[in-house]
């Protein structure tokens, strides 16, 4: 049985970890970094770049470089958050046939789970390279406040990447696992404040020691799935653009290339301001107009940056207040505060958290890696490698159905521990009604229209009866991944209809299968490209080596042999100009065969040289025949030196 890896699929960066010898280990990627940018680029030649290579070429390929796609996953095109992103992103966000928000790259529409799958494939490959075996199973984390569609879409992304998602767990819960695993026994209540690249979560978690077993129980969770580091970057970009327009009279918002350079610079400046009091954004030749090139140089102080994002930091406090209230706790009941997510490194954020909770946040948790570590621990629990750990997570939002008058009737309240099941009996609204439509909703608003629609299905063939008479039992069943299954049953006839909630948007099974096949085909292309590079390198090295040897030892072989080698070398060099792996391999073999005689001469020469050295060391105690051979060797060396002159 292979390892179950833990993946933190982040908005800005992703991370992968695995249990090894009972301890979680964060795995470095092929570039040697412990986190990988969640960036995917589609090159002109059809190649797909992921991670740091994709991020590096973003400036020159802005329209086809996708980042922060997690903010679109499982969302409808009409949602106001998506509409807000359309104006900010250099790439195109379009409406899919099912009304979901998709992206368009090089004239092709792509679903966000497909883009996330590329990042997951990179994480999978990172783990496989480290473990030396195939990986097919994973625990993937999502923001605690992700709704059902977003969780389902994340699971789909895993499938497209060739991973069986054994469990979807909430990011703050994963961070709590990472924090609480090696803590001394005893009960404690912790607040996990998770401010990442695109989402914010707060979870109140109780870690209890029950008969030697670590129990992690989520008491309440809250958050905002459209608030994170990307928004902080955007405030900085807007400020710089405004300043530049004041000075130079040029609006950089209309220049995609300039904006991409500015985005990188803003991110860097934001990070620098976490340790320094001032930084300068310096971008020469940012743009040009009739008067010539323009250079951008803007000084930003930490105080200025803090004033730009003050309301964003403040927005994280209300969910903290609500989560505490839902958990039935006071601020004094919290023993530890843990900060997770890169944006939580900002001093102003830490100051606000300290101000609200009345205590310093813990510094012994790595904000970038804790979530992946927790996911790996959960993988270990599922595999039986980690014992004595029980994780009790919750559903972040209430679930219910639409009833008469457009009201949402809740069957499962928010912060209910999952897995869970709830049933309620409903009836018909009209006389002789033969079918009912079950409209499934998620959210906290009283009216159905204010909540997220997860999907709907019909229960038909209800026997004619006066309104209010038929007994229709609706059952909601949430699995451990927080994904909902709904059934409706007519108690009189026993007729039942069930669905696993597939958002009335979402990807259909056929689409997922097609994307899985696309990804597999792409993996095969990658493998072939890799093999071509390997054989090309081998052939190149052989040509170089034979060329060098021919220069040194060419006079030791016949002119005929030399000509054969030179021809084989020319053929190999010609093959290297093309992309046919088999041709390169065949020409390389031909060159290896042709240069065999040359190799023999080199070997004989080196053996002879060694023999001479041995005789000399023996002080002349060798036979005359040996001496004759030695003389030959010295002669040959002498001739070679003379030739070079």
Curated annotation (Swiss-Prot):
Pfam families: HSP70 (PF00012). Keywords: ATP-binding, Chaperone, Nucleotide-binding, Phosphoprotein, Stress response. GO terms for molecular function: ATP binding; ATP-dependent protein folding chaperone; unfolded protein binding. The keyword Chaperone applies. It comes from the Bacteria. Residues 601-645 are annotated as: Disordered. The modification Phosphothreonine is found at residue 199. Induction: By stress conditions e.g. heat shock. PANTHER family: HEAT SHOCK PROTEIN 70KDA. Acts as a chaperone. Belongs to the heat shock protein 70 family. This is Chaperone protein DnaK.
């Amino acid at each position: 049985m292979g390892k179950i890896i833990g993946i933190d699929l982040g908005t800005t960066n992703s991370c992968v970890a695995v249990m090894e010898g009972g301890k979680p280990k964060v795995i470095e990627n092929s570039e040697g970094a412990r986190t990988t940018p969640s960036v995917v680029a589609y090159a002109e030649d059809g190649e797909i770049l992921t991670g740091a290579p994709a991020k590096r070429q973003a400036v020159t390929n802005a329209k086809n470089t996708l980042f922060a796609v997690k903010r679109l996953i499982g969302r409808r095109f009409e949602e106001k958050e998506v509409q807000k992103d359309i104006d900010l992103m250099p790439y195109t966000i379009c409406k899919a046939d099912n009304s979901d928000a998709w992206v368009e790259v090089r004239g092709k529409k792509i679903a966000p789970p497909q883009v996330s799958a590329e990042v997951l494939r990179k994480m999978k490959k990172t783990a496989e390279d480290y473990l030396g075996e195939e990986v097919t199973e994973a625990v993937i984390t999502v923001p605690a406040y992700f709704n059902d569609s977003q969780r389902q879409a994340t699971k789909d992304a895993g499938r497209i990447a060739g991973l069986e998602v054994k469990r979807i767990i909430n990011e703050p819960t994963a961070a709590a696992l990472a924090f609480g695993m090696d803590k001394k026994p005893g009960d404690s209540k912790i607040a996990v404040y998770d401010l990442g690249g695109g989402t914010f979560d707060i979870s109140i978690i109780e870690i209890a020691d029950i008969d030697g077993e670590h129990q992690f129980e989520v008491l309440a969770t809250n958050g905002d799935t459209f608030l994170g580091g990307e928004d902080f970057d955007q405030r900085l970009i807007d400020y710089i653009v405004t300043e530049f327009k004041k000075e130079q009279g040029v609006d950089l918002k209309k220049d995609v290339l300039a904006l991409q350079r500015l985005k990188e610079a803003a991110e860097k400046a934001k990070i620098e301001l976490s340790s320094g009091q001032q930084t300068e954004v310096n971008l020469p030749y940012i743009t040009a107009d009739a008067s010539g090139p323009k250079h951008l140089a803007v000084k930003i102080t930490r105080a200025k940056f803090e004033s730009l994002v003050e309301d964003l930091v403040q927005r994280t406090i209300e969910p903290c207040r609500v989560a505490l209230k839902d958990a039935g706790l006071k601020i004094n009941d919290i023993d530890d505060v843990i900060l997770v997510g890169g944006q939580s490194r900002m001093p102003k954020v830490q100051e606000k958290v300290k101000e609200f909770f009345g205590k310093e946040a813990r510094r012994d948790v790595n904000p970038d890696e804790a979530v992946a570590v927790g996911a790996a621990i959960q993988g270990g629990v599922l595999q039986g490698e980690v014992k004595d750990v029980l994780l009790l997570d919750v559903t972040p939002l209430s679930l219910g159905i639409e009833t008469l008058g457009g009201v949402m009737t809740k069957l499962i309240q928010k912060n209910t521990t999952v897995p869970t099941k709830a049933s309620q009996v409903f009836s018909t609204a009209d006389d002789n009604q033969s079918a009912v439509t079950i409209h499934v909703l998620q959210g906290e608003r009283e009216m159905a229209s204010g909540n997220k629609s997860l999907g709907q299905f019909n229960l038909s063939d209800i026997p004619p009866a006066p309104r209010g008479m038929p007994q229709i039992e609706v059952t909601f069943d949430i699995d451990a991944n927080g994904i909902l299954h709904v059934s409706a049953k007519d108690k009189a006839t026993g007729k039942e209809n069930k669905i696993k909630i597939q958002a009335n948007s979402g990807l259909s099974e056929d689409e997922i299968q097609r994307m899985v096949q696309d990804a597999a085909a792409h993996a095969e292309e990658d493998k072939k490209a890799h093999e071509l590079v390997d054989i090309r390198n081998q052939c190149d090295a052989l040509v170089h080596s034979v060329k060098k040897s021919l220069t040194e030892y060419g006079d030791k072989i016949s002119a005929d042999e030399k000509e054969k080698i030179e021809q084989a070398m020319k053929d190999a060099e010609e093959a290297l100009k093309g992309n046919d792996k088999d041709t390169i391999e065949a020409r390389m073999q031909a060159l290896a065969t042709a240069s065999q005689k040359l190799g023999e001469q080199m070997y004989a020469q080196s053996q002879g040289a060694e023999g001479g050295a041995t005789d000399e060391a023996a002080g002349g105690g060798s036979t005359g025949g040996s001496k004759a051979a030695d003389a030959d060797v010295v002669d040959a060396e002498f001739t070679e030196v003379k030739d070079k002159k």
